[in-house]
Each structure stands twice: as C-alpha cells, then as structure tokens.
Amino acid sequence: MSFIRNTIVLGALSALTAAQTTPPKLDASCADVVIFMVRGNDAPYHDGRTFPFVEATCGKLRAEGKTCDYIDVQFDVTLGGDYCAQVAEGARNGISQITAFNQKCPCSHIVVNGYSEGAHVMGDVLGGPGDCTFVSNGLDNTSSAGKAIAAALLWGDVMHTANQPYNVLDGASKQKNPRSPSDLARLNRYAPVLRSYCAAGDPVCAGGNTVADHLNYFQLYTDDASSWVVSKINNVAPLCPASSSSAVPTPTASVSASVIGGNTPTATVSASVIGGNTPTATGAATVYPTSPAVVAPFPRPISYDTCVLKVHVEYCYE
C-alpha cells in the first residue's frame, strides 16, 4: 500500500510569500449558507483559482434572497513542507472550525470545498485519515455539525477513489492513490451530499499526464458546481424552525450593536434578541436567526497572472 510522504500539488501558483502572508478569513456571519474553503499546496487564501466558486455560489444564492458567506480552513501549505503534517493540521482545524461555527450558528447550512491537497484535507475532515498517521474517524455525520453539511465538493483529490457514485467527469473510474476500504466507508457516510471532480488526464487524482487537467477545474466547472450546490441547498430541510431562521431580531436600544452581522449576542443580552421573543432570565435555548445576517464584501482574490509552473510529486512506498 502506498504511503504519501510528500505530495506537492501541480499548479501555476502564486509566489510563496503571497501564500504565507495572505491572512485567512476565520469567521463568518450566521448567513443562510457558509462555505468552508480548503486551499491547495502553496496557494494563498482567497486564491484566484478557486475563489470564483465562492463568488458564483453566493451570487446564485443571493439572487434567491439567501445570505451567503465563507470561511477559510487554516493550515500550512508551504511548498516542500511535510505533506502529512500539513494534511493532519488541516483536518484537525477543519473539524474544529466547522464544529465551532455550527455551535455559533446552528441554523446555517454548511458547504465544504477542497482542491488538490485541500481535497485530501476535506476528505479527512469527513472520513478520517487517508494514508497519513492523523488519528480520527472524521466528523460524525449524525452530529449537529455533520447534519449541517448540505454539500461537499472535492476537486483533483489526492485520495480520489474510482467508481464512487459521487464521482464526476471522465476520471470517475480512475485513481492514483485511493483511500483504504475503511477510510472510504467513513467518507461515504456523506455520499448523498458529496461530489468529486476528477479529469482523466489529471496526474494527481487519476494518474494521468495532462497537467492542465489539474489546473483548470474551476475555469471549466464552476458554473456546474455552484448550480449543484444551490440545488442541494434548495432541497435540504431547514436546520431550525422557520420562525427561528427567518425572524428579524428586535434588540433593545441599549444592546443593538451586539447583533450586527448576525454575530452571537453577549450573555447579558442574548435573551433580548431571540427572534423578537420575550426575554428570559437565562437565554438558555437561544436560536440565532440567519436571514438578517449582514455579510461583509468579499476580499479581492489573489491573482495568478504572474505565476510560474511548479511541478513536484513524490511518493514513498512501503
């Protein structure tokens, strides 16, 4: 069985300094939908290759009157770094960040999106470790956070496994370094909401020889993927009663600033903003509304206009 020691994703990548100095977006408002983005190796946060997916998906949701925001999964993607350590860090942080956000915003539907090394990370978030020594069974699909995931997308996945019902494109029946049966079984708990894009020529997910097939997913399939996500959102059951998810909060004048952007109210005033209901002494059963959330403008994606091609893939076999 192959063991990935170091896989450097193929790509026309921005300078390493940009990848390491661009700060991640680690929080979001309690919007109707929040997308968790997981970047590829050596890519910056808000990277120009994958961010069009966020813009397209949120644009279509907003056209339907829904609010939409995103969060970056934080992890190191330094070129030439310890690949398994990077994936483990990303998986741990992904589970932690998704769980924490769901606790803050239990009415928000979650979409997860990972590209290349980021697809490996997101696969591990959902299904546990893929060939690395990170010990986890993944995010329980029956947990509150797991149930909140309405759609999950993997693109050019390092651990792409052939012939899965959620595989799409002409690489659906191909694989390079597939997940073990036990890892795959855990990942497949999310099969109803999962989609994995793999082109036949992609060297990373399909063992092909066409570098461009790994680089152009979002140029070719962003519209298709974003429409699929919107369809999943429109066909999923609400996470909270309609009165909770759509009610406009009515804070008192003294605490109005505490609920701007759908953020969690402070403990002293939380009871006064629950869907306009009569305040209680403890606010123990707080349900935070989503629709009134205020979403800040998205940052400008990091451009790839002046990039250089970097290609390096290593495998160690046991």
Residue ranges of predicted features:
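Active-site catalytic motif of lipid deacylating hydrolases and related acyltransferases
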Residues: 23-108, 194-222, 231, 235
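Fungal extracellular Ser/Thr-rich, low-complexity intrinsically disordered regions
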Residues: 19-26, 231, 238-318
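Short, conserved catalytic or adaptor-binding loops enriched in Gly and charged residues
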Residues: 61-64, 145, 184-190
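Serine-dependent carboxylesterase/thioesterase catalytic core
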Residues: 94-113, 117-180, 185
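Conserved beta-strand elements of beta-rich interaction domains across eukaryotes
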Residues: 14-15, 159-160, 202
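C-terminal catalytic-base region of ester-bond hydrolases, centering on the histidine
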Residues: 164-252
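Fungal secretory targeting signals
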Residues: 1-22, 318
